[in-house]
Amino acid sequence: MGEDSYLCLSEEIKKKLEEYSEKDGYDLDSLICSRRHGGLTYNDIIILPGYIDFEVNSVSLESHITKKIVLKTPFMSSPMDTVTESDMAINLALLGGIGVIHHNCTIEEQTEMVRKVKKFENGFITSPIVLSLNHRVRDVRRIKEELGFSGIPITDTGQLNGKLLGIVTSRDIQFHNNDESFLSEVMTKDLVTGSEGIRLEEANEILRSCKKGKLPIVDKEGNLTALLSRSDLMKNLHFPLASKLPDSKQLICAAAVGTRPDDRIRLKHLVEAGLDIVVLDSSQGNSIYQINMIKWIKKEFPNLEVIAGNVVTREQAANLISAGADALRVGMGSGSICITQEIMAVGRPQATAVYAVSEFASKFGVPTIADGGIENIGHITKALALGASAVMMGNLLAGTTESPGQYYYRDGQRLKSYRGMGSIDAMEHLSGKNKGDNAASSRYFGEADTIRVAQGVSGSVIDKGSLHVYVPYLRTGLQHSLQDIGVQNLTELRKQVKEKNIRFEFRTVASQLEGNVHGLDSYQKKLWS
């Protein structure tokens, strides 16, 4: 962009261009002007094309989602009970994004979901399941059935830091019919081990060469200190974009909590399970409750990243940034299943909100996450151009194989349920159990209300297939969008927007109709293959 885009021009043509007092279109500051255009949504704006001098596969989508954590794909799934549980969180993290596990469930259920994410891709497993010689084959089968893995080290104490004696894998017991046999009869004793302090890359190389399923890590005395899994090595090869911590190589895990006293207890359990990012889940984040919660978290868990929100104005953002937020969620009433703007008459059009909050937060190095109203790749591109570091999606990811719930058929279409956390259905979830665990009511400050006021609806969405096809489609589409704009990464996108080299246009209703399919008797809109 900028001067580089004039490299192919003759001096005469360049001079003629420079005779114009202004470039085509608007700069972003001029476009997002409430006095001129009112509040704008994503459909109200379009980005003008730039100059291409690079291949699309060279476009990097790396971006901060908090002050410390960087993703290779700036996609997040919303903490909704029909969008994100452990399956979504694991698979989105493998593809370079991150899923935020909802909290419309018991503390135990949410903690177990976090634990599943952290255990999925372990790097060095520092708290492996360990058995002793006194355990039996049935114990290994039970662990396999309950936790989904085998390859269990055997020590003299049956605990970590005991003397390593052997290992029992699924192959050792595959054709062994006596479940009462002691493990000493079936375990493998000829082991390949790594020494304590070995680098992960070196340990992975040993696994490659020895062709074993597990690599026990032992100290000088032969005591077990950690374990490395071959299955994790394969995951590293198959998912190079995976969102992982650089030291442990575990998948990054995020989960939502509220701001009630009980949520402090909930958060302690989540942190013990390995939580990396907490999302404070509220439709209106500018409250004394959230400010106090941020301060408490920063005191109790200084290494935990805090995403606060939701906010739509600079003034709201200022309070949460001052309290110590590491990132902000932006959006109020813009989601497809949200009726806050209609019912409460409070909120803000999403494009204007993302721009206003992102522009202010960037002065303090605080990333923003555009949450709500994302319907397609174009909306993702616009949100990032408006200043967001990532997008949070509910509707766009609901209906995938990895989202919670069962498929059902209606009129020949395969569907999944999708509901807003402000819907009556979500608010009544767990009503027969502990009402204190209902996140939907607390999110809208309504847990003490005798009459529930809905700020969302329940509905259904069409089957979108697996994330492993759908997310690469979104990712590749975003790369093509950035190529059309003429930037190779998101840092350059924000820089060129700030320097007013990337230009925008306001779209009238007629221009929006023109920019969509029109003039056909019928058509089929197939978006990917």
Swiss-Prot record:
K(+) binds at G333, G335, C338, E514, G515. Residues 124-185, 187-243 form the CBS domain. One of its GO terms (cellular component) is cytoplasm. The keyword Oxidoreductase applies. The active site is at C338 (thioimidate intermediate), R443 (proton acceptor). The keyword Oxidoreductase applies. Keywords: CBS domain, Cytoplasm, GMP biosynthesis, Metal-binding, NAD, Oxidoreductase, Potassium, Purine biosynthesis, Repeat. This is Inosine-5'-monophosphate dehydrogenase. It comes from Pneumocystis carinii.
